[in-house]
């Protein structure tokens, strides 16, 4: 299984769905492959052939589990949805893989969810007390349970009834006997786009999935919107009170694929601009700019262009290190970062180096890389981060550590600099981050993005999660 280092945020999940094509499951597999960066723990596909639903869910990468020629026989039908998972709630177990499926009174109902619900404990408690039995520890099952228990007569009304009870960040792709449905939460925290593949509507977390299958981008699913796709066409309803969209800023900073388009620009362009703004704010004398791969490459290019300091690939990242090499023995574990990163000495030796990365979470990986660069003969090592310090955990679908594990939550800049071992450590300001996103400044009254990891301003109530976390910590 693919393993991200502990000094970066973990991706959430990716969703995909397509309606009305004989190759639905094949195209869904390809779409999920392009969204693999959003989750590597497992993948699943549910298809519908007009009579029956078919489901395959497996732990591991998409290419390892859905690469055989029998996929159309395993997952027949003209409509399919899929999901790649990185667990933010629920353990990494096969039963927690999505899409989740249930046979309801009105027919089959499969759901793939990207995000995280914030009031699951209270809802689950009520459901269990009223007789519900849960088969998973995923918050997505709560959606199925609420839809099943709704007293509304029509399926869409049952879904709206459910959405009015849950709180949190969610982009949903739902498959029923006759419909493919896309849903985005009222703030639009998690992404969802609508496309078209030769007349077949497509839903996906990112435009890179549309590009993979040769589909045309139509538009983003709007915040608070339900898109209903049937043989009659595409219908849009907005059951919620209209509020301004506040997408997660980390989609542009880190999570989304560099080639995905958000707000009419590629994600690569935003990340390059982050590096450009970082250089504008920090005048550091150095001989070379080196990205910490792969996440720091775009920002390092922008930093290099603005500062006129040469860009070099001074650190090489191995793409072939899995959990097998990380976990089994202390002898192998102690090599840690060296298994994933190696230093190109010719770019480093006798030079003043500026390392660039997109974020720093715990600081453990950063400190080891700084040490490696010094050991390769660097005169000075400076570390630049192309976003503000991450001081607060996320509860909306990103797997972040708690406050005690976030280096910026418990340490000031001077302390962090000493901990990572660099000559200097500098971050992009919040205003600089917004400038890179195309805004003159952050709207303090109504921020354009969900940026709580930097500011601690959570747009959706998290009191229930904090209460549960506090209780668990005291046990």
Predicted regions and their residues:
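Flexible loop/turn segments at secondary-structure boundaries
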Residues: 23-25, 88-89, 119, 189-190, ...
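Generic beta-strand/beta-sheet core signal
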Residues: 112, 175, 183-184, 195, ...
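Amphipathic alpha-helical
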Residues: 142-153, 293, 305-323
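A conserved beta-strand->alpha-helix junction
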Residues: 66, 136, 141, 311-322, ...
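PRPP-dependent phosphoribosyltransferase catalytic core
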Residues: 163, 178-179, 196, 214-220, ...
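Short, glycine/charge-rich flexible loops or terminal/linker lids adjacent to PRPP-binding catalytic cores
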Residues: 308-353, 364, 391-397
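Conserved short alpha-helical segments that host acidic/polar catalytic motifs at enzyme active sites
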Residues: 1-223, 228-286, 292, 380
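Phosphate/diphosphate-binding loops
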Residues: 161, 209, 216-217, 221-225, ...
């Amino acid at each position: 299984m693919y393993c991200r280092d502990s000094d970066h945020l973990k991706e959430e999940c990716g969703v995909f769905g397509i309606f009305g094509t004989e190759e639905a499951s094949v195209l869904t597999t390809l779409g999920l492959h392009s969204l693999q960066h959003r989750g590597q723990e497992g993948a699943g596909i549910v298809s519908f052939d007009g009579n029956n639903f078919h489901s395959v869910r497996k732990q591991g990468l998409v290419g390892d589990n859905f690469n055989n020629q029998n996929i159309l026989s395993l997952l027949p039908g003209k409509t399919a949805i899929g999901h790649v998972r990185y667990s933010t709630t629920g353990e990494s177990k096969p039963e927690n893989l999505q899409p989740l499926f249930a046979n309801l009174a009105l027919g089959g109902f499969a759901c793939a969810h990207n995000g995280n619900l914030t009031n699951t404990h209270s809802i689950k408690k009520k459901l269990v007390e009223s007789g519900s039995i849960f088969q998973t520890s995923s918050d997505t099952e709560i959606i199925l349970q609420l839809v099943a228990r709704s007293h509304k007569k029509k399926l869409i009304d049952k879904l709206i009834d459910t959405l009015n009870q849950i709180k949190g960040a969610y982009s949903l792709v739902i498959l029923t006997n006759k419909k493919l449905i896309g849903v985005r939460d009222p703030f639009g925290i998690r992404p969802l786009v609508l496309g078209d593949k030769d007349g077949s509507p497509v839903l996906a977390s990112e435009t890179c999935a549309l590009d993979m299958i040769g589909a045309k981008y139509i538009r983003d699913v709007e915040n608070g919107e339900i898109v209903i796709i049937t043989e009659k066409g595409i219908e849009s309803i907005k059951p919620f009170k209209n509020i301004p969209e506040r997408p997660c800023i980390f989609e542009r900073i880190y999570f989304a694929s560099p080639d995905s388009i958000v707000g009419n620009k590629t994600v690569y362009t935003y990340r390059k601009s982050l590096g450009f703004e970082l250089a504008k704010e920090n005048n550091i004398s150095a001989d070379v700019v080196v990205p910490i791969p792969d996440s720091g490459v775009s920002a390092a290019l922008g930093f290099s262009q603005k500062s006129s300091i040469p860009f070099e690939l001074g650190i090489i990242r191995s793409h072939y290190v899995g959990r097998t090499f990380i976990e089994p023995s202390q002898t192998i574990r102690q090599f840690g970062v060296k298994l994933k990163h190696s230093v190109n000495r010719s770019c480093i030796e006798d030079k003043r180096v500026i390392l660039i990365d997109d974020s720093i979470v715990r600081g453990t990986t950063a400190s080891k890389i700084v040490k490696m660069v010094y050991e390769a003969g660097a005169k000075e090592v400076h570390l630049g981060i192309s976003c503000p310090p991450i001081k607060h955990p996320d509860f909306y679908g990103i797997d972040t550590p708690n406050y005690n594990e976030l280096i910026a939550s418990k340490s000031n800049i001077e302390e962090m600099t000493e901990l990572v071992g660099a000559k200097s450590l500098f971050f992009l300001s919040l205003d600089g981050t917004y400038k890179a996103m195309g805004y003159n400044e952050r709207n303090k009254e109504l921020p354009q993005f969900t940026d709580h990891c930097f500011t601690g301003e959570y747009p959706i109530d998290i009191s229930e999660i904090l209460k549960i976390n506090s209780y668990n910590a005291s046990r």
